[in-house]
Amino acid sequence: MAKTLPFPGGNQAARARQAKALLLPIPRSMAVELILPVHIALDALRRGAGSTSAVQTLTQTMLLTGFLCDLGYGEMTYEQLRTADQALAVTFERGRESGEWRFDEAHIELFSYIVSTYDAQLQRAPLSALTDASAQLDRIIANGDAQPTLRKQA
């Protein structure tokens, strides 16, 4: 059987395309596909029609948003993240105990800000930053750390 000769130029071109893609934001259609379930989860919790899944979606969104802010794509304070984390814990406990999956009125504005920030991050941050943030989230999930340590931002 004949062997093909390796052409280093082909692999080099593919690597160059990959490297370039990591520096660019994701396509708008992909950003819309990623943000739509987040908006749906926020709306469900706003209306009192949420679920465990909606709380999990917004927990992951809060963490990803924080990680991307740490990388320089957006602004959130430690206090905002801490308040959001506490609100999610209260919402989850209430939902488990009473079946009522909703945000308190005081937290809707904060989560609207988080979701809007995440939406902007998906449109502007390069793929490399999104990949890094996603890898951080994956590590938290793999470790079973339900309460990751939130870093104070300077």
Q: Where on the chain are the PLM-derived regions?
A:
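A ubiquitous short alpha-helical element
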Residues: 23-27, 73-77, 96-100
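Short, low-complexity cationic-aromatic patches
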Residues: 44-58, 96-112
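Amphipathic alpha-helical binding modules
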Residues: 101-154
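Short hydrophobic short-linear motifs embedded
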Residues: 5-7
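Extended intrinsically disordered, low-complexity coil regions enriched in Ser, Thr, Gly, Ala
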Residues: 59-90, 120-134
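Short terminal alpha-helical segments
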Residues: 10-71
